[in-house]
Every structure is written in C-alpha cells, then in structure tokens.
Amino acid sequence: MKIYSLLVVKDEADVVGLSVADACRWSDKVIVIDNGSTDGTWELLQAMADDNPRIVPFMRYEGPFHIGLRSKAFAAFRREMHLGDWWCVRLDADEFYPGDVPALLRSIPWYCRTVKKISTDYVITHEDLAENILSGDFAADRPRLHYCLPDKRRERRFMRHSPFLVWLARWRYPHPWGFVARQSIPVDHYQYRSVEQMQRRYANRQQAKAEGCGSFSHESGASWQEYLRHRSDCTAVNTMHDNGLPPSVEI
C-alpha cells in the first residue's frame, strides 16, 4: 500500500519543514506545488528534497490560487498508483497527524472510498499576546499553544485510489467520493502560529479572494486580529502527544 500526499503551499516557511518531515513518516511521496511563495518556502522544500526522496517539489505556480491546483499533481502521478493505494488528496502545511495513518487506512472497509480528518484547531488568544508567551518561532511555540476551538471539524483528506477517479481543475476533490468511512483520523491543526504569520495569512487570502479563487469564503474578517480568540471561548488542551493517541475516532 502506497500513500501519495498532495500539498499546496504559499509562504509557510515557519511550519512547512516540520509538517512535511512529519508527513514523510507515513507518506511514500509528498508532492508539492508552490503557489508563489516569497518567504523561502520553496527553497526550503527543495533543500529538504535533496536529502529525502519522499519529498517531490513538483511545480511552482505563480498564478492566482484556485481550488483545483492539486489536480495537476494528481494527473501527473496517478499512473504510479494501483488498487489498494491511497491519496491524501489534501495535505496542508499547518496540519500534523499524531496517529498511525497507514494502520488506520488498512483498517478501512473495502467498500469505503473516503476518510475524513477530525481536527483539533489550535488558536492564539488575546491573553497569549498580552502575556507575551510567543517567540515567533513555531517549533519553540508549539508546546505553548494550549487552546483550541471547541468544535471538532471534519473534512475529506484521504481517498482510495481507483482508475475511475476523475479530478477536474474546477473541483476541490476527485470524484466519485464513494462511501465515507465511519472512522476519522485525528489531526493537530495550527492555522495560527504568530502575529507575523496571521498578518501574512490574512493578506494572502484576501488577495486570493479578490482574484476569484473560489475559496476562503469564511475569511470575512476586517483584519488579521479577528483570528484571535478569548480563552473563555476556547477549550484548553494538552498539547504534548506521546503517540499513544488512538489512530481513529468514531463519528
């Protein structure tokens, strides 16, 4: 069983080295499309690829972001896949998988074609900034992020390979999806990591929306500061995993 993971990045040098190294634990290939990074993300991934053949810097795309960018990598590598293999159809640079991904996928019933993630969505709080606990170095700050959104989000992440899968550029995922597995795979999601990163995220997404990307409709705030939360509205979590986390959660 192979797992090919499809990653689109833009200006995520603060986290992508850690998340891609983590994804290489369970991915046979991490196939990367860079959407015009200017912060050294692409160069970092190329340097990592020199030492790790699982990392494939596939292409650099300077045009406007659109939801079907990953379809380009899917089309280029689908001939390497066979029945029994899996696609991570959306690997995000700010997501970490603490469980045993291959073991979970092997446990999925044969008739299920899609597996969702269930994410712990970490946030930066107003109190974090007031207490000045963050250094701006995500590797150092990750254990200091102790609050997450109260609701667990589920989104498609893995699809079983089939020669009948079709992925058009206007689609977010390949079709047909088929049956969705009851098991979901846990993900630690760090979409907010520092003030500088939140400012950059806000600017990039506003630009993408203005260019008609067809995504980020939830990004409706007036400034990056609307990413911040109050601790009273969040759930406190233990951020240190010991890899004893169960690999799946029942829906």
Language model feature labels by segment:
Residues 26, 48-51:
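Short, structured coil segments at secondary-structure junctions
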Residues 42, 46, 66-81:
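Short, conserved alpha-helix that lines the donor NDP-sugar binding/gating region
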Residues 20-32:
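Short, acidic, metal-binding catalytic loop of nucleotide-sugar glycosyltransferases
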Residues 34-45, 62-65, 92-93:
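A conserved acidic beta->alpha catalytic loop
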Residues 51-68, 72:
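Conserved donor nucleotide-binding strand/loop of the catalytic core
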Residues 67-75, 86-89, 97-251:
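Catalytic-site signature of metal-activated, phosphate-bearing donor transferases
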Residues 4-6, 29-31, 56:
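A structural signal for isolated positions on well-ordered beta-strands in alpha/beta enzyme cores
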Residues 2-21, 36:
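Active-site beta-to-alpha loop of glycosyltransferases that engages the nucleotide-sugar donor
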